Amino acid sequence: MRKIGYYEYNPVIYPRKLCVAIGMNQDDANNCFKGRNGERLIVDFRDSDALTFDSVIQKKDGKYTVFVNFANKSVMTMGICSHEASHICDAIEEDIGMKHGGEPSAYLIGWISSCINKARLGIGDFVEIKDRGK
């Protein structure tokens, strides 16, 4: 049976974690994360292969994070992953007041892309959702 959860990555120099899930449903996403104003996350893959939530808080520790959820592993193509990495980069830069462009942005996008690929390969700190539906 497949474990349900997400991979968590810490960029160290930026005050935002990156959480990457593959196929997480709406209930599980809302058990782990909430919007910064307490709103529920809407997970709907009918028109999307992936969803990036840029203004969320992890419920386990109250820390701000960027959360990306891919519908399944097969949609994690270079194009889709790059597209989501761009959104994630924009979100982190906006949060910390960093101007987009140049080497700092290129390195950040590279780190994000690497994290997404690691999640696709099953590498990283996996946070398993336990006690589902209780």
Explain the meaning of each model-derived region.
Residues M1-D49:
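Non-catalytic terminal regions of proteins
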